[in-house]
Amino acid sequence: MNTMNFSVQFKVRGDDFGGHFINGISMADSESFWKCKLVSADDDKNVYESADGYKIIAYHVKKGDVFECYTVFENNTDSVVTLDMISSFAITDLDFDTLHRATSFWSAEGKMLSQKLTDLNMERSWSGHGIRIEKFGQVGSMPVRKWFPFVAIENSEKNEFIGVQLYCPSSWQIELFRYKEPLTLLGGLADFDYGHWCKEIKPNESFTTPKAVVAVGDSLLKVCDMLVKAQQPDISPVDEDLPVIFNEYCTSWGNPTIENLEKTAKKLQGSGVKYLVMDSGWYKEEDKNWWETIGDWNVSKKLFPNGLKEVNDMIKSYGLVPGIWFEMENVAPLSQI
């Protein structure tokens, strides 16, 4: 496809919700959006002004193979404005027939789910009146829970694909909806209805959404490859050969003693495994469970009275590289900090 029609969707508290039976399902297509007028557009952005005194700048900056999208909302009024929804990206006038999503949970593999829009009841209504919508996302601090913050749509006749990834480490949502024929794809922070998100913006202040990246290609694999490369992953040279890592958690279940680790090291010697990683429990305090003291990261004197050097030297003696497990973002109830 040669061009994409980038747009924006937002909802200011106090304005009417959208019509066509969308209320309660989505905050898109609201009065806030319809009170806006496109005042300028160029290759990088669309600028909208509202009759109520807001200015919205929807960026879609081309960077390499992708478009980097985000939205800036400026409150140019004399009153505090509460945003209940605002998109990081929105693309309109789409003619596609298949939706691709990636599903997963904690401690699970990602799986691609591909569905025809007809299987999702996304055909227009007989009168064209009722909006059809497929909305998904997750609420909480786990960016991937049930769904990846990713979507791709496909026109199977033309072999056209659009892929999107949200850079949103919090509650997020993605929506595909149609009113009559054209489809609209949008996403960003979870709205007030879905994720109880809102943002108060004082007079002469602004709010910038998290970013999204958008890729266009002739296969699902290509657009996914573009989205990954857009992250500019910094791959360490030690990972270039995809070394095999053995994590010992399922052998000691949070009790990684020297004796347990040596039994494992003996089994792994000469197997082609490069790393032996000691998992949870190496820091646990006496008479406490390993999950109750996460956060202090003090070496257990009971498990390792001579410190970690002794166990590290033992692991190395079997031709393995020692590793250690942390969850630096976690603090448990019985930790000292």
Residue ranges of predicted features:
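Polysaccharide-binding surfaces and accessory modules of carbohydrate-active proteins
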Residues: 2-179, 195
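Short, structured beta-strand/loop micro-motifs enriched in basic residues and often containing a Trp
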Residues: 184-196
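Short coil/turn motifs at secondary-structure junctions
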Residues: 76-78, 216-217, 329-331
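Terminal connector regions
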Residues: 215-243, 250
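Primarily single-stranded nucleic-acid-binding OB-fold modules
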Residues: 168, 182-183, 252
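Short Pro-Gly-centered flexible turn/kink motifs
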Residues: 199-217
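Aromatic-lined carbohydrate-binding/catalytic grooves of carbohydrate-active enzymes
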Residues: 239-337
